[in-house]
């Protein structure tokens, strides 16, 4: 009904009750125009009986309402007698509104038979869900601090514990571990998950052999990609039996060359790779995966540590030529520089594809070769008209002390995304043997938590990886190649390992680091650690692992190339 008001028993009542308006009309038509007060139930019941028999009741109600709505719109549109009746109704300051649109709305709603869901939110459940999301983010931000990264577990250069990674820190109890939460695909592409299962999965993902630092990356697409890449694997990359045997073969080569040189040329400087042997399968996996991504040319820059191993076991330098250099037999075409500064070029076969490899000559000054490599890559990209930066890849290798201590690193990173200097991203590898010459305590070598913290100045993600887990190392290599090719940005791999000998083979590290080296001397080699793992998994037998070592040693005795992927260079690709 329409909206004028009357006072009944001293209460304001709207005209929504037709009995009231009809009673008013009856009073008005009977000459009793006044405000009704004190309407008791006896009179009201009598009125009900009257309303049932009067012309104002029953089906005529709708007719009277329509008349009154017409009167509200245009008083002249109704009969003069009705106009006089409506004019005599009590006046009110409220604006009267027709009821027909309201009735039409409810009729339409009934026809549509629409049911709206009402969500009742439990404040306690909502608060718990917020804490679950905070728990997940704690692992994404700080899980790397509790990752199993140090092969010898000697010096806790990280914080000893991270309280945010404990569910109790977020006010959960042991009873909550069996509670299921709807996380709406926030992690692991799961809708519902028990808190206990979530805690276990997060620990496996972010606190295993890989510690990923990526939450400082501001670009959401890059951050989501990195996050998904690690979480989809639960930090447990899957490798085929053939791939595992190949990884062991490459570790055997890295270990075998160093042992051979140490026995054949004792005391000669070679800046051994021992302890960081996983560097060799890391580099070869980068080449293989880059080739699958369309890379045709890779330029490397590195210092002295592990360089001889890189020359023989990756680029395919003949061991015989290296032995001649140790013996002092220098070619007249050479510069006369030391053997661990020499450059090299070769072709590397990946299936039916070839990748041209170049190792830049290294000046003795640490890190100076990095901008040289970037310039060489940029010029090759220009020569190939490689405007998308897909065909030529830069890979630079650093030491843990040098990457944190040399100013040229910052200068090179600063130019990495500048339009005139960018090469579409560089893969930067740190051979982190946790010691700089004779200093291992990070409180004495740097002011940052990690040696790679400088990477954060350009928001480069950092993959910390345990050097005793070659499968994790290979996964890090693939991840780095894919990230670089997709986003054209720098990415760091922090290969955390150790140095089995002194800074060079003439040094005795027990004199300066007796505690550290008493542990290292008892620690098995990376080859031995992985061989035992594969034997336990049933991938190979102990006899096969030993045979692998013997075959490599025989190849060195013959002086032949030991890289099966080596190919004669295409003359058009020669440097």
Language model features: what each stretch is:
Residues 425-428, 432, 440-459, 495-528:
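Flexible glycine/proline-rich, aromatic-decorated loop/lid segments
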Residues 42-43, 48-89, 93-96:
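Subset of Sec-pathway N-terminal targeting signals
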């Amino acid at each position: 009904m329409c909206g004028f008001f009357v006072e009944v028993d001293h209460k304001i009542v709207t005209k929504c009750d037709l009995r009231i308006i009809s009673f008013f009309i009856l009073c008005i038509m009977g000459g009793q125009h006044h405000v009704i007060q004190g309407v008791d139930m006896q009179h009201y019941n009598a009125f009900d009986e009257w309303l049932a028999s009067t012309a104002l009741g029953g089906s005529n109600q709708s007719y009277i309402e329509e008349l009154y709505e017409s009167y509200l719109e245009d008083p002249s549109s109704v009969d003069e007698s009705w106009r006089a009746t409506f004019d005599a109704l009590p006046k009110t300051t409220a604006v009267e509104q027709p009821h027909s649109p309201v009735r039409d709305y409810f009729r339409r709603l009934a026809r549509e038979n629409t049911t709206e869901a009402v969500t009742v939110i439990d404040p306690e459940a909502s608060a718990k869900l917020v804490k679950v999301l905070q728990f997940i983010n704690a692992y994404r931000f700080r899980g790397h601090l509790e990752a199993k990264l140090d092969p010898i577990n000697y010096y806790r250069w990280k914080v000893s514990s991270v309280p945010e990674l404990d569910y109790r820190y977020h006010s959960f109890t042991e009873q909550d571990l069996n509670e299921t939460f709807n996380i709406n695909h926030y992690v692991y592409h799961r809708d519902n998950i028990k808190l206990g299962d979530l805690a276990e999965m997060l620990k496996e993902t972010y606190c295993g052999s890989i510690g990923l630092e990526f939450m400082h990356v501001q670009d959401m697409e890059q951050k989501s990609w990195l996050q998904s890449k690690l979480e989809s694997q639960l930090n447990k990359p899957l490798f085929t039996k053939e791939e595992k045997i190949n990884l062991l073969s490459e570790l055997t080569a890295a270990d075998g060359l160093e042992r051979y040189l140490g026995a054949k040329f004792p005391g000669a400087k070679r800046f051994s790779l021992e302890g960081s042997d996983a560097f060799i399968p890391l580099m070869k996996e980068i080449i293989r995966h880059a080739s699958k991504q369309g890379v045709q040319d890779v330029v490397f820059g590195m210092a002295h540590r592990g360089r001889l191993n890189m020359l023989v076991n990756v680029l395919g330098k003949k061991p015989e030529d290296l032995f001649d250099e140790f013996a002092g037999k220098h070619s007249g075409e050479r510069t006369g520089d030391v053997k661990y500064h020499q450059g090299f070029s070769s072709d590397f076969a990946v299936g039916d594809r070839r990748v041209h490899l170049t190792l830049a000559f290294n000046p003795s000054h640490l890190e100076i070769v990095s901008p040289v490599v970037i310039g060489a890559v940029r010029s090759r990209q220009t020569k190939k008209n490689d405007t998308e930066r897909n065909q030529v890849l830069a890979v630079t290798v650093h030491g843990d002390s040098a990457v944190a201590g040399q100013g040229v690193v910052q200068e090179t990173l600063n130019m990495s995304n500048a339009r005139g200097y960018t090469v579409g991203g560089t893969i930067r590898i740190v051979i982190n043997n946790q010691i700089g010459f004779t200093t291992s305590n990070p409180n004495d070598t740097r002011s940052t938590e990690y040696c790679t913290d400088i990477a954060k100045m350009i928001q480069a993600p950092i993959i910390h990886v345990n050097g005793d887990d070659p499968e994790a190392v290979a996964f890090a290599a693939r991840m780095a190649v894919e990230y670089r090719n997709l986003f054209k940005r720098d990415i760091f791999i922090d290969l955390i390992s150790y140095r089995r000998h002194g800074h060079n083979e003439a040094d005795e590290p027990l004199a300066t680091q007796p505690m550290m080296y008493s542990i290292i001397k008892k620690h098995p080699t990376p080859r031995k650690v992985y061989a035992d793992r594969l034997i336990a998994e049933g991938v190979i037998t102990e006899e096969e692992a030993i045979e692998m070592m013997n075959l490599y040693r025989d190849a060195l005795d013959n002086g032949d190339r030991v890289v099966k992927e080596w190919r004669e260079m295409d003359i058009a690709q020669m440097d």
